[in-house]
């Protein structure tokens, strides 16, 4: 299981080439991660397998 933490920068694997965001919350029980994608998009929930860590906070 990928270890993601609040503040990590992540790339959304099923998104476009510029779809990166910041982890806001991680639910270990459901393996869902809330990612902030910017002020125009806001936060979205993704399964942790759909994300790749770009760099740590």
Predicted regions and their residues:
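Basic/aromatic-rich interaction segments and small domains that mediate binding to polyanionic partners
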Residues: 3-56
């Amino acid at each position: 299981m990928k270890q993601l933490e609040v503040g990590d920068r992540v790339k959304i694997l099923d998104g476009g080439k510029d779809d990166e965001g910041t982890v806001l919350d991680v639910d270990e029980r459901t393996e869902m991660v809330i990612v902030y994608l910017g002020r125009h998009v806001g936060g979205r929930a993704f399964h942790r397998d759909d994300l790749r860590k770009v760099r740590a906070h």
